[in-house]
């Protein structure tokens, strides 16, 4: 039997990825990894008694090249007698609307598409073509970003319904398999763009590390990840138990933690408990950095009253408020129709508002020495925290200082000859 098929069978069995009678949606981009995955699973489907459905998303990037990718996937699926689902998405528009990177927008749309297909065909599993090399690259990128133990463990082989049958297969083994079976997968030209950090890591940094430090740098990275993963699994279980003890109240939109009980935990558990609480509300931890959570925990330890606005996830984010006895996490309201952005402000602190290209800094200062002539000063006790900042919309009014009554913002803009954006 082909070496890749043997390794794939071992991996699937080791991690209990598939069971007889299941339907498996296979994400296929047309590149070497997913092409080899679909072809290999087709060879093993009868032995495993699984039904396969290929799924390909046209992201709306790369023009004619993407059209050829879709055509290739359809022809490959037909040759293997596998039903195929193709869908087109306007990822560039979604990226602009939600202010995301191209890769993040594509990832979100792609995962939503695969889950829709899985629901439509009553599939129990979604198989992705992530390889051993992808694991190494992801771990190193996480390391350079300043990740904690969770990021150093890399992505898991199984995160139901997602499974990764090529988890232990190298990119070189993929290429050898494609050549041995006469497969001619598509080559994504964007993989040559060194503006993307992953591409630069793959083509420049990893070869340099292998040449000057350790020819088996990938093995070393994965060995470390394996050790970290085992420790991480144990600590995550402990943190889940601690979260139940710390949690005072929970709903779909809010979680309240006992700050004093949280503070009594070991530091490693404190961070993990807070991460798990955020993940339960947000569904994931992408863009939630170490520094932000650590600042919240420092406020708990100091007994301070502070508030933090976690990065927004499209229309929703998490607002975190630390008080003397509680730490409360709540989902921010979705922006109102016609309101391009809205965000909770950190008081005190600095809040980046990417859609507007601005940052708002709030400080708590003693009243003495302030010059009210050239700035607005508010009494802290008179403010209803949290403070929500948003872009203006038609009909908004304000009370300008020195003016008796209110005035429409639109009229103020007209008076000052401020053009519409």
Each language-model region and where it sits:
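Internal, active-site/partner-interface "lid" segment
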Residues: 191-196, 219-226
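Short amphipathic alpha-helical segments with coiled-coil-like heptad repeat character
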Residues: 114, 213-216, 420-421
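AMP-forming adenylation/ATP pyrophosphatase catalytic core
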Residues: 4-32, 53, 57, 89-91, ...
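Inter-helical turn/loop segments and adjacent helix faces that build the functional surface
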Residues: 208-220
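Core alpha/beta nucleotide-donor-binding catalytic domains of modification enzymes
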Residues: 1-28, 32-207, 237
């Amino acid at each position: 039997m082909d070496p890749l098929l043997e390794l794939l069978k071992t991996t699937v069995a080791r991690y209990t990825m598939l069971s007889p009678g299941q339907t498996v949606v296979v994400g296929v981009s047309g590149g070497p990894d997913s092409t080899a995955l679909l072809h290999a699973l087709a060879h093993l489907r009868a032995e495993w008694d699984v039904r396969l459905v290929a799924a390909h998303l046209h992201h709306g990037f790369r023009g004619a090249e993407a059209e050829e990718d879709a055509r290739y996937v359809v022809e490959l699926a037909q040759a293997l007698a596998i039903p195929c689902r193709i869908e087109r998405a306007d990822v560039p528009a979604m990226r602009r609307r939600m202010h995301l990177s191209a890769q993040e927008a594509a990832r979100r749309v792609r995962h939503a598409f695969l889950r829709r297909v899985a629901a439509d065909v009553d599939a129990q599993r979604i198989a992705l073509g992530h390889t051993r090399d992808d694991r190494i690259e992801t771990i190193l990128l996480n390391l350079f970003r300043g990740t904690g133990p969770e990021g150093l463990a890399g992505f898991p082989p199984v995160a139901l319904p997602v499974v990764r049958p090529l988890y232990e297969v190298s990119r070189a083994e993929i290429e050898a398999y494609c050549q041995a079976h006469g497969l001619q997968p598509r080559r994504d030209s964007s993989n040559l763009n060194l503006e993307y950090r992953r591409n630069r890591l793959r083509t420049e940094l990893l070869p340099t590390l292998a040449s000057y430090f350790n020819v088996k740098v990938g093995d070393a990275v994965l060995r470390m990840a394996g050790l970290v993963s085992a420790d991480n699994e144990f600590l995550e279980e402990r943190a889940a138990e601690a979260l139940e003890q710390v949690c005072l109240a929970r709903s779909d939109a809010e979680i309240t933690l006992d700050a004093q009980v949280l503070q009594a935990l070991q530091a490693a558990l404190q961070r993990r408990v807070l991460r798990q609480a955020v993940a339960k509300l947000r569904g994931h931890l992408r863009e939630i950095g170490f520094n932000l959570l650590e600042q919240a925990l420092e406020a708990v330890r100091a007994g301070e009253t502070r508030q933090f606005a976690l990065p927004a996830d499209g229309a929703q984010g998490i607002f975190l408020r630390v008080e003397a006895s509680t730490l409360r996490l709540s989902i921010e309201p979705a922006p109102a129709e016609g309101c391009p952005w809205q965000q909770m402000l950190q008081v005190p602190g600095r809040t980046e508002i990417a859609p507007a290209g601005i940052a708002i800094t709030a400080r708590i200062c003693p009243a003495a020495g302030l010059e009210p002539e050239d700035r607005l000063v508010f009494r802290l006790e008179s403010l209803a925290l949290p403070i929500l900042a948003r872009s203006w919309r038609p009909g908004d009014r304000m009370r300008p200082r020195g003016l008796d009554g209110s005035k429409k913002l639109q009229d103020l803009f007209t008076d000052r000859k401020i053009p519409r954006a």
